[in-house]
Amino acid sequence: MNITPVSKNTTEPLACIENIDNHIYDYSPSNEEPKYLKRSKSESTTKLSRQLPRTPSNKYHARNKRRPYSTTPPISLNIPSSPFIHSEFSLNSSSSESSDLESLPDLSEDRDTPFSSPINRNPLTPNNSFFSFTKKNGPIECLLPKRTQISIFEIPEIVYKIVEFADIQNTAVPQEGTPIRRKPLSSNHALLIYGDKKQAELSLQDHYDEHNNDGMLFNCLQVNKLFNQVTTEIISQKFFFSDEMKLHSFLQNLKITQIKSKPSLFVFHKLFHAKQDIIELIKSHMDFSNLQWLEFYMCPKLLPTPEFLSCGTKIKKIVITGSKVIDDGFLSMVAKKCPNLEVLDIRACELISDSGIYQIAKRCTKLTTVNFGRKNKGNLITDSSICILIRNNPNLKTVGLAGCHITDKTLWDLAIRCSDHLQRLSLNNCPHITNQSIPLILHSNLFKNISVLELRFANQITNFKPIIEFKRRQEFRGISILIEVCESLCLMMREQELEMDKVISQRIFEDISYWANDNNDGDVPYQSFINSRRHK
């Protein structure tokens, strides 16, 4: 038998499949028995130990020292079957050489015994056998695509939703909360409102809403690269500060990092000592083309520059309260650049007058919330500008005119044009409002959706009977309404309410008495009723 190599693959052996001949060797049977082949004890192919690979054991190495290594080359186990081969090399225990084989130890039970003679490893044969390599790294497995599992934390859309939800749940923008009702002016005022001493004492105390910000977005920055990128993008959309020390620390780092952010929200909250230099520094490092919410709450020395309104068509909310530098010129600039403005709150800006509000009224026609309340210089805001603003903005829901010198004319315009939408109306300290406006408007059943009406120190209003009746009608409809008045007006309102209750009680009693004492009330007399029952 001659085995001659046909081809060689120096890079990678061919694949081995049991039913396919790879033609690595040409096999030609001959009559001569090869001299280098040696018979060995047969093993049953049905045993499980025959099917599993073996590793040399210590017992095998000890026995192998007494035997010289075979110099025969490795023979492929995938030799084609033929009758000659089966008869020539049959390894059956019933052969004539059984006596010689009985003297050898039984290796069938030795689990660490290999099937073939040991082979010296060299660069040409790095593995135990040719088939051990092909089974591990066959070409079929190499051609199959590798299965990769994508985590949900690697999908940008899902990560953006996760971080956005974390931002909504944990990020608290500093702003003034809307109180359920204003703090009473005195202890007697609190007793008049609540009627209970404990509740009156609680109402006079200051309540602060504590928000637990545990740095959720900071943790999101450290998840992976995608989380860091998405979180940085979301953080850059909101720029707000309520602590001057933190603001100065940020500005120092801003000079070094040269960050260029694009916020949609810009809020400064109660920075009483901040100066205009801060605005000049910040505007050079920010792009305000996406700004929608601009708020300077109680920042008396800060003035927004024209860069803040560079893309004013996107701005929908401007809140600037307690400013000593905002004037009519700023409102004129807002009116020109912010036609889509919806919320304008400029309380306690004493330099604002009818001139600036007139410009807003002419150009901004989508307003839903306006607040021009003030304590001083209320004479600068009158009917001449407010009436035009009401006529051009019929969708007003919240109107604050505290301290302004408006008259009943403005309130009637508001009742006619904004009656269906108005929900909150503040008329505190309005000296020119009389009984010809609010009492008659509510008696006419206008302001059907109003929920808060503030009339503190509106001392010319003395007729509260229509107001009380309107409140009771709203409560009967299931709509709760809050009417805020000062202590003197509260006493007057309570007295008129008691008089109304007395009149109502007296009418109820008269109706019951008339029904009980009327002879012709339609009831059958008792004797007639008894007689009719007897006849039945």
UniProtKB/Swiss-Prot annotation:
Q: Where is this region: Disordered?
A: 27-77, 94-123
Low complexity bias: where? Answer: 94-106
Single Gene Ontology BP annotation: SCF-dependent proteasomal ubiquitin-dependent protein catabolic process
Task: Outline what the protein does.
Answer: Negative regulator of the mitotic exit network (MEN), required for multiple cell cycle checkpoints. Required for daughter cell separation and chromosome stability. Involved in copper sensitivity.
Q: Where along the chain is composition biased (Basic and acidic residues)? A: 32-44
Q: What is this protein called?
A: Antagonist of mitotic exit network protein 1
Query: What is an example of a Pfam family matching this protein?
Result: LRR_6
**What species is this protein from?**
Debaryomyces hansenii (strain ATCC 36239 / CBS 767 / BCRC 21394 / JCM 1990 / NBRC 0083 / IGC 2968) (Yeast)
Query: Which keywords does this Swiss-Prot/TrEMBL entry list?
Result: Cell cycle, Cell division, Cytoplasm, Mitosis, Nucleus
Query: Polar residues bias: where?
Result: 45-58, 114-123
Lineage start: Eukaryota, Fungi, Dikarya, Ascomycota, Saccharomycotina
The GO cellular component terms are: cytoplasm; nucleus; SCF ubiquitin ligase complex
* Subcellular location, record wording: Cytoplasm; Nucleus
Top-rank lineage group of the source organism: Eukaryota
* Xref: PANTHER family: F-BOX PROTEIN YLR352W, PARTNER OF PAIRED, ISOFORM B-RELATED
User: Family per UniProt?
Assistant: Belongs to the AMN1 family.
* Keyword Cell cycle among record annotations: yes
Q: Is Cell cycle among the key words of this record?
A: yes
